[in-house]
Amino acid sequence: MSRSLIERRLTDVSQRLRRVREELALLDEQREVFTDAAEDARVRSLVSETPIAHREYEEAQRHADAMDRSRRLLLGQIAELSATQDELLDRLVVSSD
């Protein structure tokens, strides 16, 4: 692979990695809100002991769980992109020798 192609791919991967990290930061903020809401709903459910409060808790917890799944996916993407970036950097070093 030519040096210029490696550099282009490295730039692309770096930009994608930055975007995914920004998305993760935003998701973490949203996740905190959903987790807090689920915890509040759980406490209300325990205190009120009504079916409606329990359903509200379950719904809030589903949202928090969905955020956790999304976070795991983003972390996986970050790991893949980081590995690709490392591989490209290794190739760049080898091609410059």
Model feature map: region roles:
Residues 11, 29-32, 54-62, 78-84:
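Short, charged, amphipathic alpha-helical segments
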Residues 21-24, 63-84:
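Amphipathic alpha-helical coiled-coil segments
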Residues 3, 24-31, 75:
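Amphipathic, non-membrane alpha-helical segments in soluble helical-bundle scaffolds
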Residues 1-17, 89-97:
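Short, charge-rich amphipathic alpha-helices with coiled-coil/heptad character
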Residues 27-52:
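Extended alpha-helical coiled-coil "stalk/arm" regions
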Residues 47-70:
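Short, glycine/alanine-rich amphipathic alpha-helical segment
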Residues 11-16, 22, 26-29:
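N-terminal acidic leader/helix
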